[in-house]
């Protein structure tokens, strides 16, 4: 359904009574920490798997003889699959009502696809060497197979990631969404630490009896972790059963409508969700080049000052980059554990402050048609929605609050270390500023250890990126009563994460082509300039984030 002007002007209020009467509105029990760990542990496997691509992808492609501008084009696989695959997976899983649930079948299939793609990535040169005798043809086919493996791996990662995020929204109460997403951030942090630690260790020596290369051992370990963690989530987490609905459109029709009415879907988002998406757009424009090129950047600085005889030692340079990412992951994991405890718990002040919110410019009356988010004709009427959206909502648990009061130990610790006035939006804004400063600092960096220190500091910002936007977004979905369409809603959110990465890739390609025109030395400064452009985008994300600040900030 498209958004029409009359519908926007004559919307009806989605009241708490309507939400309560919805057949999708059912009681969700309070979830224990063990349940949340089982729910989010699949993200650990996903991140460890993705660390293969992040830590070794670019150096691996360089080792195959690929030039930088071509590697940037290949890395467009990630955002493209994010734009296409996550919404499709969300729409399909929203419609599934199988015995084992809506999300878990997709997670299991994607984990098997990820295992196959890792095998293809690690053994592509060996496969081509076995089949082809012509060296030139062998190299070309190896590059093709490596590219296919990267695309398949991105599809698998996106499906598991989207399904897990939707499962969090489906299975956890609104007042526990922050805690659940904090656990998700921790799992991603642990996956990062393990992944980059494995990338730094000489795996080919540790597992010398296998006679595998470093990348091949890494791919085997990543495959095991992906299948194991997804299996744990599938076994120990039960999904909610939603009432069956009669869909007025086919699956293909709904997918086609999603992409053709993307603009209307974005326009129909409530104020807070829309602002979160805008922040994510500029944030990921900056993060994408960092994640894919920082290993190479650190390696370049290492080679510039490498000991005599090691000037072309790209294996050691890659390990130096992996060590930087290991520090990055450790700081990120520590921050994901500590930062939530520093947030101010404003529940006691919520009622007093909410009365002032109605007079604030960010307390906005919106009339949105959410028909394009419905799952079928029997879905509770969500079209013609008029809602009063305030970042502080009366009679709702604080969306900045992380831990339920039942977690007495953690609440006690948090009460001792809380920073007055520190809320999720303020912390998120600060993280963008910090990341932007770090990227611009590449102007002054000269050695690999300086770059490693800078990368480690960025772990603070990455911790916030993995946790805060998802906490705000999923909590808002729950409060709006849109859980039955959470897969599609998260698909819209992911478009704002993936689209800027495509744009960032195009800009990086232009920068690389210009640098190749002047000289073909791989150790030029073009990657540093791509990182600096990302830093400028981080400041734009901070500017957009101001709309989410507390009303008295």
Swiss-Prot record:
The keyword Transmembrane applies. The keyword Membrane applies. Residues 1-21, 374-392 have a biased composition (Polar residues). The chain crosses the membrane at residues 34-54, 73-93, 112-132, 141-161, 187-207, 217-237, 281-301, 323-343, 425-445, 453-473, 495-515, 522-542. It is a multi-pass membrane protein. Its main location: membrane. One of its GO terms (biological process) is maltose import across plasma membrane. GO terms for molecular function: maltose:proton symporter activity; sucrose:proton symporter activity. Residues 1-33, 94-111, 162-186, 238-280, 344-424, 474-494, 543-553 are cytoplasmic. Keywords: Membrane, Sugar transport, Symport, Transmembrane, Transmembrane helix, Transport. Coiled coil: none annotated. It is found in: Membrane. Residues 55-72, 133-140, 208-216, 302-322, 446-452, 516-521 are extracellular. Residues 1-26, 368-399 are annotated as: Disordered. InterPro entries: MFS_trans_sf (IPR036259). Responsible for the transport of maltose and sucrose into the cell, with the concomitant uptake of protons (symport system). Belongs to the glycoside-pentoside-hexuronide (GPH) cation symporter transporter (TC 2.A.2.4) family. This is General alpha-glucoside permease. It comes from Schizosaccharomyces pombe (strain 972 / ATCC 24843) (Fission yeast). The lineage of its organism: Eukaryota, Fungi, Dikarya, Ascomycota, Taphrinomycotina.
